[in-house]
């Protein structure tokens, strides 16, 4: 979430200075700062296409003024994206069927791979052979989308390997998953959590908003058992596959919202999706939450504040502060970390570790 409502904070030092004052009622010790490289850090990029005089350009549009900016190079994008952008554009410019009613492109990379998604205002079935040729000639994993339709050439799944405390963690996911778009910072976030856990007495972990298992797989060795919840069926399927990739057997995934889990733990409602999981078998010493921008609602806060230790990863300092007002009634902030996910922008990712008073 952007800090631009509070000022033009772009550098990590400026963000740090603001956050120290903004959260001073909860935390007065030293913050841990995690910087990112300032170029080629972002693994996801979305661009529009601009058509003029029968040719094609990458473009971005200012959301307020609607002013158009022709894009030739993205210095923040992963090197694989930067290298592929001109090759793709040259190919599209030479194929009238492919460039007709093409309005957008999404690039996604991992350390190993790259995929692109082309977005159309027409029936992509009519250009299926052209799209297949593009995928084959440029040797690219390609997805094409138009209203109600999706075509996949080669594969839409990407493989990723993260290095966490001298361990390699293997993942597979696709473009529909929520992905931390700065791989180096993602590794630093997970490592920060692991370093905290190294000093803790641990039993079982409850994780909410687990996605495809980004944190879950890396934290599995620290706990006897993990219960991880997520509402996306696709994410759950990838999480299960990622357990197989890492030979991990102590994670139990449940396709439940956080609100539904709260009802289940309080025994106010039974869920068929929990039929193979005995909640009473878990002894949660820690909770990990990585919520969307809206933060945690009251039912989730009431649930997690029962447990001794809370790890809160936040993409929105404003909702984090609101949630801490409630959580600080029962817990104390022990560690606070700042992750410069998007360099030279007002965005900031925070990590907070709380323990019960």
UniProtKB/Swiss-Prot annotation:
Cited CDD domains: AdoMet_MTases (cd02440)
Active-site positions on this chain: 315 (nucleophile), 349 (proton acceptor)
Gene Ontology biological process terms, A to Z: methylation; tRNA processing
Pfam families: tRNA_U5-meth_tr
Taxonomic superkingdom: Bacteria
Substrates-to-products reaction catalysed: uridine(54) in tRNA + S-adenosyl-L-methionine = 5-methyluridine(54) in tRNA + S-adenosyl-L-homocysteine + H(+); uridine(341) in tmRNA + S-adenosyl-L-methionine = 5-methyluridine(341) in tmRNA + S-adenosyl-L-homocysteine + H(+)
GO cellular component assignments: cytosol
GO molecular function: rRNA binding; tRNA (uracil(54)-C5)-methyltransferase activity, S-adenosyl methionine-dependent; tRNA binding
Residue ranges of coiled coil: none
Root EC class: transferase
Record keywords: Methyltransferase, S-adenosyl-L-methionine, Transferase, tRNA processing
Record-listed E.C. numbers: 2.1.1.-, 2.1.1.35
Binding site for S-adenosyl-L-methionine: 180, 209, 214, 230, 290
Chain's role: Dual-specificity methyltransferase that catalyzes the formation of 5-methyluridine at position 54 (m5U54) in all tRNAs, and that of position 341 (m5U341) in tmRNA (transfer-mRNA).
Family: Belongs to the class I-like SAM-binding methyltransferase superfamily. RNA M5U methyltransferase family. TrmA subfamily.
The protein, known as: tRNA/tmRNA (uracil-C(5))-methyltransferase
This protein's encoding gene: trmA
